[in-house]
Amino acid sequence: MANGNKQAGQRISPSLTLLLATACGIIVANLYYAQPLVGLISKAIGLSPSGAGLIVTLTQIGYVAGLLFLVPLGDIIENKKLIVVSLLLSAAALTLTAFVKHGTLFLAAAFFVGLGSIAAQVLVPFASYLASDAARGRVVGNVMSGLLLGIMLSRPISSLVADIWGWNAIFALSAVVSVILAIVLSKVLPARKPTANTNYTALLGSMWKLLRTTPVLRRRAIYHAFVFGAFSLFWTTVPLLLSGPDFHFSQKAIALYALVGIAGAVTAPIGGRLADRGLTRLATGIALGVVVVSLLLPLMIQSSSPVGITVLVAAAILLDMGVSANLVLSQRAIFSLAPEIRSRLNGLFMAIFFLGGAIGSSIGGWAYASGGWSTALWIGIAFPVIALLYFITEK
């Protein structure tokens, strides 16, 4: 068999697992750095208030395009090369975002930042190839912990860096880090050349068939699309609540609040270990239930008192715990399928649930503007409840 498949099933070292987790966190953070800085960026590059949302939207569109059209390449071309080229593309786009002053050029660069960030989703199945069957859940869980930490840390880090050095600095710093990471990974990662005998057109054509004929993929994508929709809705609206007249949180205080979500990432490896022990179904039900509870708490107790703030902190931790665990359980289930199609399965899974997150964000902003915090929470609760009801039908 080819190089990469000989590697599969070997024991992955703790140091390589840590490197992959760190790399995933660094890469995926690029998708979120701009979110708390949209107001500052739009003024600097001359975008109207109505066009400011395109900064985040085009990054997301670029990422989804990469998930659908680039990540599947991991099934037919050498993985390390795909990872390094994607990182260098992202670094070039980040450099442009740091220095261009023209709105159209910035938005084009934002698209390519998203496109290049798919390197993280090539690394995750890559880690699963290197792990033995018995340890696959644990390894994927550890790598996903790094990815989730990147998501959770990105917003407070970009806010704090912008507060000190200006909004450009975070993109310039990330460009430098991306180049360094590309060099390190090119030296350290083992080669993996897939054995799939197909061309790119046939590869893309097979994805719709995979979605139709793989029930585990469909179920797991639907579960996590609703869960991630609730996650995105919460983290889109809670900064609006905290900066409003009831709480009067500063940008730094909101950044510190966002840091509490880090505690939730610790459940990712726990979820992986439970899956390795054959407890995927039980753990999935618990994870979905935790997400429902996390949104019920702030709905039942709404106050700007210390008790109310404590409830919001607990809600953030529980939400991130449930989402993190469900993500790892889902990827463990998907990566247990045929290894030669893992990149396509992962690309489809990520694209579907990321679309759910984008819908959650947009609905959250509308719900908060239309009916306030309670309306947003009720809609947010509906998402994991639907996922839980669908989960009950699983045989």
Swiss-Prot record:
The entry's keywords: Cell membrane, Membrane, Transmembrane, Transmembrane helix, Transport
Endoplasmic reticulum among keywords: no
GO cellular component: a single term: plasma membrane
Cellular localization per UniProt: Cell membrane
Coiled coil: none
Residue ranges of the TM segments: 18-38, 53-73, 82-102, 106-126, 142-162, 164-184, 222-242, 252-272, 282-302, 309-329, 347-367, 372-392
Pfam families: MFS_1
InterPro entries named in the record: MFS, MFS_dom, MFS_trans_sf
Membrane disposition: Multi-pass membrane protein
CDD domains hit by this protein: MFS_NepI_like (cd17324)
Listed GO MF terms: transmembrane transporter activity
Recorded superkingdom: Bacteria
Primary location class: membrane
Family classification: Belongs to the major facilitator superfamily.
Protein known as: Uncharacterized MFS-type transporter YdeR
Organism field: Bacillus subtilis (strain 168)
Gene name linked to the record: ydeR
